[in-house]
Regions:
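Helix-loop boundary and gating motifs at the non-cytosolic
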Residues: 2-55, 215-257, 261-265
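Symmetry-related core transmembrane helices of the 12-TM Major Facilitator Superfamily/SLC fold
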Residues: 160-178, 384-399
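Conserved MFS/SLC helix-loop-helix module at the cytosolic interface between two early adjacent transmembrane helices
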Residues: 54-92
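Juxtamembrane intracellular "pre-TM" segments in multi-pass secondary transporters
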Residues: 1-4, 181-221
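C-terminal ends and interior cores of transmembrane alpha-helices
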Residues: 79-93, 300-313
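C-terminal transmembrane bundle of multi-pass solute transporters/carriers
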Residues: 7-13, 45-49, 55-59, 66, ...
Length: 410
């Protein structure tokens, strides 16, 4: 069967990723808090199960992708993550939530690194930055489509979004098997593969790339801080809204939390689409210095937004800075991906990208339970303030990379 061109497949995959993610996770906090009965610590521990799986398997799956096939790694990832989503919807049990999250993290490692490396090799380093931004926009459009579907399903049964989201991902894995090309990647020839020795050689080459680059070493520190802060925000921000505020009526119309979170997620996507379009127009993604300056501003804004969200006693101000945070954070992903791919040789690209993901996962494993415990024993507000403080070094570190890149080829 004839394969499709790489860019349309990449963009469709990003759309499906956004669709299924928002379909499932628009109302997942309500499912976990109200149906499963999870508290702040359990919410974070579920995320920690995911991050432990990512930490354990991120680099091994990246190495396998560099040795054998990025295409195979990606389609396996869609199959496994689809199964994982379906598991959580089987019954409202904390044990199933943890199992689902661990399997989701395992499946994610097959996509992380490999998918980005695949499209970079297919279209080239200079073209891929703009494609990452377009891909992010397609993810957001998919998310926009997923929100009303998820809300409607959740109104009938809170478990239904998990089941449908999982089925869509598994089906898309079959589509990738049939139509996803792989023409830009050259695997290690079978005759040159020597079992575990090939794995260790690929890993060693990836480590050497990072160790020889002061830019990548500094970025590794940023990845750690990003991991340390993010679990508190991802798991506790919406729970903080439920804990602190009574959700108001709009124009005399009473809305339950499900409807409110649907509206909020729609706003997140609309503003994120706008921020990505602005970045696409203003940031020259072929020039690393431009990307770095943008990332410095993005992370400074994120820190400020988290702090204001945590201390605000106003529902509408909290919503406004939450939307701002989500919009600028959305830009950080494709810009980081574009810059990082510019620094890495093709033969170890998936491995090094997976190392960055592993550092992020390690940060989430270390920071998540600690901040979750703070949220349980003190307050979600305290946990979120600590999260902002943890992220605060990121912007100065991006400034440092800008200075270093004048001495080291970027």
């Amino acid at each position: 069967m004839k394969k499709l061109n790489a860019p349309p497949v990449y963009l469709l995959a990003m759309f499906i990723a956004g669709l299924t993610t928002k379909l499932v996770f628009t109302t997942h906090i309500i499912y976990r808090v109200q149906l499963v009965g999870m508290d702040a610590l359990q919410l974070v521990l579920a995320g920690t199960a995911l991050e432990i799986a990512v930490f354990l398997f991120e680099v091994p799956t990246g190495i396998v992708a560099d040795i054998y096939s990025r295409r195979l790694s990606t389609l396996l990832g869609f199959f496994i993550t689809g199964i994982a989503l379906g598991i959580e919807g089987l019954a409202p049990l904390f044990s199933l939530v943890v199992l689902s999250q661990a399997l989701l993290g395992f499946g994610f490692t097959f996509i992380s690194g490999a998918f980005s490396a695949w499209i970079t090799d297919e279209v080239g380093v200079r073209r891929v930055g703009e494609l990452f931004l377009r891909g992010r926009q397609l993810t957001l459009l998919g998310s926009l489509a997923g929100i009303p579907i998820g809300v409607m399903l959740a109104e009938s049964a809170l478990a239904l979004p998990f089941i449908l989201g999982g089925l869509i991902r598994v089906t898309f894995g079959i589509f990738l098997f049939l139509f996803m090309p792989e023409t830009g990647f050259t695997p290690i020839p079978k005759a040159a593969r020597t079992g575990w020795k090939t794995v260790f050689v690929t890993f060693s080459e990836g480590v050497a790339v990072v160790r020889k680059s002061s830019l990548l070493l500094t970025f590794a520190l940023i990845a750690l801080f990003v991991g340390l802060y993010s679990e508190a925000w991802d798991r506790l921000a919406q729970a903080h809204l439920l804990e602190i505020f009574v959700f108001p009526a709009i124009g005399g119309l009473e809305l339950d939390p499900i409807a409110w979170f649907g509206l909020l997620n729609t706003a997140f996507i609309v503003f994120s689409l706008a921020s990505n379009e602005i970045a696409k127009r203003l940031v020259d993604t072929a020039r690393s210095q431009r990307i770095l300056r943008a990332l410095e501003s993005v992370y400074a804004t994120m820190v400020l937004a988290i702090f204001i969200f945590a201390v605000s006693g106003s529902f509408y101000l909290s919503i406004a800075v939450m939307i701002l945070f989500d919009a600028v954070r959305s830009v950080s992903f494709p810009l980081t991906e574009a810059w990082l791919n510019q620094q890495i040789k093709s033969n170890v690209r998936a491995t090094v990208l997976s190392m960055a993901g592993q550092l992020d996962a390690f940060g989430e494993i270390a920071g998540g339970p600690a901040l979750g415990a703070v949220g349980r024993w003190f307050s979600t507000q305290t946990a979120l303030i600590m999260s902002a403080l943890i992220l605060s070094p990121a912007a100065p570190l991006y400034r440092r990379i800008q200075r270093l890149s004048g001495k080291e080829k970027a």
